[in-house]
């Protein structure tokens, strides 16, 4: 076990910093990691909201190696478990998973190792962890901690609610003495509160990290000839790994066929394919044998591939959480990446029709609210990153400079009068109605609902009739993005004033908004180089080739050996000794022993021939 090895190497105690450096090969913690880890080491419950690629896994993996006993990790997908276990083993950590694909003999072997104290982390599905026989096994084990990954699946307000996750509160009740850590990258305020309540966390340490992924460029383009648009885009991404998401299996097959017909090597992936076919595509993508996967949302949650350089949405997702999660599969190594969406308002209309066919109920209301927010993001006239972060309750003061809106900004105007009309109307209808209704009142629409509520008699009725419905919708969405209005998901998406709205209503301040662009125009973002670091590009290419060869021999994805970010560090630092190699980010003691020699030889040879 890694903790044993660490103890053997010196008399000093096993600390989070030692584990970070010697096992995982990093010198410093990322934002928020240290506080979360220290809280877990002390035995406290935690809720961790951290962006994809922000280092969530280390938040429970490091405490697992510091605390005595076994850490149980509850994860929704077998592929995700396997990927995490492969990476831990590559770092010398004793880890295994328990899943439905394993034979009885394999399961018994893992159980024996659990009971003999040979394992530090065990990954398991929520379905299995709640089985009576498994709980009985756990009762006889020294549990260090229980981590619940993808914790948004617990909440009815989340975008991916799963009943088996919601039942995990029973586990906390059963093991009340064991510290729990719930982790997710996608949870708005309502979802966060629901996770805390359903999981029954006791006085938890709550870490709400920034949702910002600054290395990802967000770009929306008007969809007109989607296949041609994608082919032109892929032409700018030669040699890079990427995922193209489609809204249906039929589209996956169509797009894959068109790309292959245009001599672009791509593979399709959807739930209708045979399990062996899906496994082959996923494995080939992980190992860099396939560069592009065209997929439904069935693909991705189990992907921890750090060097995905782009994610394309052929169709708009149903909610911002899905968009954030799917685009978050790009650039997990921290290097520049791009998220491009082909947007057609008709796609939103189609999703609304699909939603209308569902039975009325709380879940339908939640889905409707989330679809409205996704539509607002797509039609945003302000910095897309600001809109995205605002949805998760995070406010960014300055535009990002790294989205299509910032790179090709819309025109702005003094919208003080329009904003005051809009906010006043929300106030006059007692902050009890949704956006469509308030716009109807503003525009003086004659309908039964407005008359029944007596809102055809209020002072703001009809004061906005000089502008179209779409114009006012754009104004309201911008006011939400600016934090002057709040759309309450738990009260039928009603509009409510925030404290920030008061100075504007009193006439103390003015406000600029974007002139509503009522027809979407294509805005292409300029492409970035991989990184601004000053590294040797030829050496980097050689290092990647060597990594692929070693990974294929070991039957591993290349990034499990070393990530692209680590190879770039090597190509910049040019290490020629073990000591210098340990200074490279991502090189720990186990990887140094296992992989350093061929990389050091290659670097020395390159220096000799190229100076």
Q: How does the language model describe each region?
A:
Residues 1-19, 366-368, 397-611:
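Accessory DNA-binding and partner-docking regions appended to nucleic-acid-acting proteins
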Residues 363-392:
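Short, charged low-complexity linear segments at domain edges
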Residues 9-23, 27-31, 35-57, 65-67, ...:
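Helicase motor core with emphasis on the C-terminal RecA-like subdomain
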